[in-house]
Amino acid sequence: MQSLLLLATLLGSALGGAIPSQSANYNGYKVMRVSGDDTSKISHIVSKLGLETWKFPKAANANVDIVVPPKKVAEFEKMSHAAGLKKQVMHENLGDSIKSEMSFRPYSYGGANDTWFQSYHKYEDHLKFMQDFQSAHSQNSEIVTSGKSHEGRDITGVHVWGSGEKGSKPAVVFHGTVHAREWITTMTVEYILAQLFDDKEAGAALLEKFDFYIFPIANPDGFVFTTESDRMWRKNREQNEGGCYGTDLNRNWPYKWEGDGSTTDPCSETYRGPSPGSAPETKASTSFIKGLADGAGVKMFVDWHSYSQLFMTPYGYSCSARAPNDDVLQEMASSFADAVKAVHGTSFTTGPICNTIYQANGNSVDWIVDEIKGETAFAAELRDTGMYGFVLPPEQIIPSGEETWAGVKAMFSKLK
């Protein structure tokens, strides 16, 4: 258990907080997937070499995904061989993988069609997409902002509804790109937005019951930073003491803020911030959602992340606590996973956050359930479990959207 907690502490500590003097260069970096029956050996290598981890294990023999700089490859190979670890290469050259992924197509709106979903896009183009999408559905949508980011950007979303007065039905809130490098969530959340209108039967039925508030990029500063400076950036862009930057926005929500599922190290990727709800982005989100709760109420909240193919229920702060309606939540999560698998064969694991991925205090899902009494709340980890991790090829955007939309529809079918 101690070794797992050490790995959680080490997650991204080497590269997670310092601001680079120029754009981060990942040429020659390898991403290695390792596993072994003694996780303390992996912890030792990560600590000794000061390596970044993308993913750490819940149990012995589970995978750890490690980023290895060119100058440390030889020593990593030597130490991992001596430790008897199993190894696979995820990215032979991370820099090349990023270059391929960042082949952004010029923006030309023609509706939320396959062309848009065939590549990733810059922040400004996402804003144009949302504006154009709203204009195309002007009778049943509006642009909304939950507030301002640390650097002054609007946290922009689209509010869509069916017949009747806007805001009159219970709210469904979807957040994407809370962690800046998780680009597949941006595109998948936008795919869901599009399907609410393009899937004429199912989308219309949902809009008759709920008002949807879709925020594809809940961390705009961090997302811009990933497109301009460091593709692997996770946090927001607040400056911390000691020259490190960023708060983990999914450890900063003002509920069960302190605990083993985050850290006080301002250079760590799981830095929870100086106080509960301190980040401007968190303040904006909590204030906006409280307003919805005080109105027609919050029926569902989903925080979309990547990667690992998980669909999770409360809680993150505790591995023993369960939501009052846990049986309903588990049934909904299972229906999501079953529907996803039926589309492209993609397997999702379900269960409470703490038991399924790791302990995470100060997260959005726990806050939604216990602080504003949202009826249902989930955390998703989208594709993949294969060799790509955060740098998922754009060819997987549409399949991810297709299967996720199927899962969303199935989940709503279980909602009373």
UniProtKB/Swiss-Prot annotation:
PROSITE patterns cross-referenced by the UniProt entry: CARBOXYPEPT_ZN_1, PEPTIDASE_M14
E.C. number(s) listed in UniProt: 3.4.17.-
Residues reported in the UniProt entry to bind substrate: 179-182, 234, 250-251, 306-307
Binding, Zn(2+): 179, 182, 305
SMART domains in alphabetical order: Zn_pept
Keyword list, A-Z: Carboxypeptidase, Disulfide bond, Hydrolase, Metal-binding, Metalloprotease, Protease, Secreted, Signal, Virulence, Zinc, Zymogen
Main location: secreted
Biological process, per Gene Ontology: proteolysis
Stretches for region Disordered: 263-283
Chain positions listed as propeptide in the UniProt record: 18-113
Co-factor binding comment: Binds 1 zinc ion per subunit.
Gene3D superfamilies per UniProt: Metallocarboxypeptidase-like, Zn peptidases
General function of this protein: Extracellular metalloprotease that contributes to pathogenicity.
Family: Belongs to the peptidase M14 family.
Descriptive protein name: Metallocarboxypeptidase A-like protein ARB_03789
The species this protein was found in: Arthroderma benhamiae (strain ATCC MYA-4681 / CBS 112371)
Upper lineage: Eukaryota, Fungi, Dikarya, Ascomycota, Pezizomycotina
